[in-house]
């Protein structure tokens, strides 16, 4: 039997460990893993070496090093780039986030391009690149606007890194946009930082588990090795758990807190949580990967039952009054440097505007749940949660992409490119384009006057637009959306049309805001 070498970055993360566990059930696969030279990763490496012997090769390095990336991918049949610095670390150390999410992606792409023959390349992206959604447009799909939230260095960096893959010289690539991931230690991991308060109560979320994500990657390798999925490559996918994992921020907290005898309203207060500037949505195209690879199992409710079964001591929380848990476990986190409440109290205007719309809007939230309409309880007039949750609703309430979306990428012609560009406030300058190869770069101009090159697939099918308007440490979507109906149709779901804020980090890494002129 021929063996296949899969090179992986990011194998020590929650998703990565699940992927290794599942992929190693394929007898024909060997792994080469790039680890940071840190205590936790060395310990994990020793454990895998004991478990898998010479089927796993581990070396220590850094994605910042092109030489390390080249060593990782040399001679591989497949390369899986899962490496990422995610929140809350990305919030505290945006420099580290850039190292992995931008520079690391660039080095991985360049290393794969340099190989002869090239390995097939799978790049794991994130739902965070879409930016905020609420009950006005809870459903989304690949091709929707990519508007990462202000101060989200993770989302912005992953957006930039993903684009490097799409218009690269890699022959066989795939991008998988991972949604929010459920893993066994999720609850405990979120009671040590103010990050939990970034999640609005009325945000749509479609979760996936680490285990199912691992099964997906295993099945991708298995089916591609067997030659069963030639159409998988050169496409972008949303990875979600499907109908049984669709919920909201409010109901996610409710499900987790039920294990310790409480719920969202017992432990939280409306004014503690952001009302916008998050990410996540329900994927209308979530079943594309499932139909190809059959990776899903169980449900959102099953996940929490399994967590409680593995952590019986959580049930001891039921004998403690909710007010005590609220004070000792959650209220103390309001003082954390990553807590929206602390930002407001310290007068951080940038973050206050970004996450609430302003100080007045935050103050109006208060502590009384009777004054806060909860979407999933049908308390928002005109928006029936159960109706919106139904996939039949999605089909008639999707965002426009500005062209005839029924056409495949091979069928789109210049009229489609011109129409899509116009809907984005710009132009396609290659009027001699004819339908055929939608992966060859053409020339575009955005409303800001930037001229850039990108393939029709990157723009029409993947949702990217002008790379010169997307600048690290800067978020100016208030301005950009005014001339870009493609952006405006969703940006103005959570931003007033007269908002004109430029959000940015200064040279000291301080979150700032000013009028965009």
Regions found by a protein language model. Name each.
Residues 4-26:
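N-terminal Rossmann NAD(P)H-binding glycine-rich loop of SDR-like oxidoreductase domains
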Residues 64, 96-107, 148, 152, ...:
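Glycine-rich NAD(P)-binding loop of the Rossmann-fold in SDR/ketoreductase-type enzymes
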Residues 85, 106-151, 174:
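Conserved Rossmann-fold NAD(P)-dependent oxidoreductase catalytic core, especially the SDR/UDP-sugar
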Residues 50-100:
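NAD(P)H-binding glycine-rich loop region in Rossmannoid oxidoreductase-like domains
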Residues 199-225:
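Substrate-positioning beta->alpha
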Residues 375-517:
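Functional cation/ligand-contacting sites centered on basic and imidazole/sulfhydryl donors
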Residues 126, 162-185, 231:
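Conserved beta-loop-beta element that borders a ligand/cofactor-binding pocket
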Residues 222-286, 291-292, 296-306, 311-323, ...:
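Mid/C-terminal beta-alpha module of Rossmann-like enzyme folds, strongest
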């Amino acid at each position: 039997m021929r063996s296949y070498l899969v090179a992986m970055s990011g194998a020590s993360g929650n998703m990565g460990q699940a992927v290794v566990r599942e992929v190693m059930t394929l007898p024909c696969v060997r792994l080469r893993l790039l680890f940071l030279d840190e205590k936790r990763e060395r310990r994990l490496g020793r454990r895998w070496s004991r478990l898998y012997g010479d089927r796993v090769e581990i070396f220590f390095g850094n994605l910042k090093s092109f030489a390390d990336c080249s060593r990782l991918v040399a001679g591989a049949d497949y390369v899986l780039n899962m490496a990422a610095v995610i929140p809350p670390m990305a919030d505290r150390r945006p420099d580290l986030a850039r190292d992995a999410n931008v520079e690391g992606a660039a080095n991985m792409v360049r290393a794969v391009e340099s190989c002869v023959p090239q390995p097939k390349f799978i790049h794991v992206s994130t739902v965070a690149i879409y930016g905020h959604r609420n009950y006005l447009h809870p459903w989304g799909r690949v091709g929707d606007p990519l508007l990462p939230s202000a101060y989200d260095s993770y989302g912005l960096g992953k957006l930039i890194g993903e684009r490097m893959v799409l218009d690269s010289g890699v022959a066989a690539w795939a991008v998988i946009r991972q949604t929010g991931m459920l893993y066994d230690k999720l609850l405990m991991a979120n009671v040590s930082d103010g990050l939990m308060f970034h999640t609005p109560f009325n945000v749509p979320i479609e979760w996936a588990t680490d285990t199912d994500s691992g099964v997906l990657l295993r099945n991708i390798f298995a089916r591609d090795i067997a030659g069963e999925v030639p159409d998988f490559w050169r496409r972008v996918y949303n990875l979600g758990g499907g109908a049984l994992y669709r919920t909201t921020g409010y109901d996610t907290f409710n499900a987790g807190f039920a294990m310790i005898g409480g719920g969202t309203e017992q432990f939280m207060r409306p004014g503690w949580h952001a009302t916008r500037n998050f990410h996540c949505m329900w994927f209308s195209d979530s079943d594309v990967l499932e139909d190809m690879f059959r990776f899903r199992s169980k449900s959102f409710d099953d996940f929490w039952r399994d967590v409680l079964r593995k952590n019986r001591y959580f049930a001891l929380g039921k004998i403690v009054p909710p007010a005590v848990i609220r004070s000792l476990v959650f209220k103390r986190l309001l003082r954390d440097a990553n807590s929206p409440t602390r930002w407001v109290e310290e007068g951080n205007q940038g973050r206050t505007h970004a996450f609430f719309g302003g100080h007045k809007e935050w103050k109006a939230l208060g502590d009384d749940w009777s004054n806060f309409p909860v979407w999933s309880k049908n308390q928002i007039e005109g928006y029936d949660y159960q109706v919106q949750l139904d996939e039949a609703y999605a089909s008639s309430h999707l965002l426009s992409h500005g062209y005839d979306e029924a056409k495949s990428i091979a069928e789109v012609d210049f009229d489609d490119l011109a129409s899509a560009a116009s809907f984005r406030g710009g132009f396609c300058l290659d009027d001699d384009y004819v339908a055929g190869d939608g992966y060859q770069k053409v020339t575009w101009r955005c409303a800001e006057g930037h001229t850039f090159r990108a393939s029709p697939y990157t723009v029409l099918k993947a949702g990217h637009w002008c790379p010169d308007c997307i600048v690290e440490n800067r978020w100016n979507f208030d301005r950009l959306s005014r001339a870009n109906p493609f952006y405006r149709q969703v940006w103005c779901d959570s931003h007033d049309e007269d908002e004109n804020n430029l959000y940015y980090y200064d040279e000291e890494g301080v979150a700032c805001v000013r009028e965009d002129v």
